[in-house]
């Protein structure tokens, strides 16, 4: 592992754990509750000591210049709600070197397993990990088993989530974001499937934040490395308090 890569990984995942806040949702669909004033919400999560913020390149350019925050991860996959049958087809919209030049220290790519366009998304993630390798940037793989062609093996208690983590690992990602599997036993299988840090996604907002925190406790006990949660944080009345509470579980428990 290169010196640049290892130092950037340690910055984003101190002691191998992280509270990452993705705010890439506004490209897919807008209005998005909590993302109307990006300056305000980004200031809140920075002040609460989030370990990373995941955004698209345009937001990073503006916010890096404004804040000097050195832990942006550039999400390079995009689609919108207007794409019809291709609305879940994430296309690559930036390179690792461009992300670096805009102020990011890591990059993120998404694959939706089982989508009719899965092969193209796998190709794009492979290109991204190769680019990132050249410039010493860590890669977050957001891999979700959610498409209509998804095949789940009868003995897979994770519902394809372990395979999603394995896809990210084998394609060269350094961190993977996956959905919660519903219980600690199955999530432990996900974490055991790969030697890279596994971050739990938040999913659609719903329920209480206390319920979200309880899931995070289960995930950490099962071997998780932290969270990559967006709507539960930026859509809340007080994002600062949400990040602080997540840090207490991920870093201090």
Residue map of PLM features:
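Alpha/beta enzyme core
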Residues: 15-67, 71-198, 206-229, 236, ...
């Amino acid at each position: 592992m290169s010196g640049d890569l290892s130092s950037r990984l340690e910055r984003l995942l101190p002691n191998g754990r992280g509270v990452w806040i993705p705010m890439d949702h506004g490209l897919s669909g807008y209005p998005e509750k909590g993302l109307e004033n990006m300056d305000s919400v980004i200031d809140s999560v920075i002040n609460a000591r989030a370990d990373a913020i995941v955004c698209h390149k345009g937001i990073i350019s503006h916010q890096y210049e404004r804040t000097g925050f050195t832990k942006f991860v550039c999400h390079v996959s995009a689609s919108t709600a207007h794409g019809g049958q291709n609305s879940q087809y994430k296309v690559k919209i930036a390179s690792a070197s461009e992300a670096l030049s805009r102020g990011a220290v890591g990059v993120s790519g998404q694959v939706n397993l089982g989508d009719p366009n899965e092969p193209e998304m796998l190709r794009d993630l492979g290109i991204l990990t190769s680019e990132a390798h050249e410039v010493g940037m860590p890669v977050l793989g957001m891999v979700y088993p959610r498409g209509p062609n998804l095949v789940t093996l009868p003995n897979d208690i994770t519902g394809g989530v372990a395979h999603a983590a394995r896809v990210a690992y084998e394609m060269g990602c350094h961190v993977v974001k996956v959905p919660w599997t519903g219980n600690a036993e199955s999530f432990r299988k996900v974490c055991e499937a790969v030697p890279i840090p596994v971050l739990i996604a938040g999913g659609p907002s719903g329920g209480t934040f206390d319920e979200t925190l309880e899931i995070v406790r289960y995930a950490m006990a099962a071997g998780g490395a932290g969270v990559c949660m967006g709507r539960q944080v930026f859509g809340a009345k007080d994002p600062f308090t949400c990040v602080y509470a997540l840090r207490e579980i991920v870093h201090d428990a």
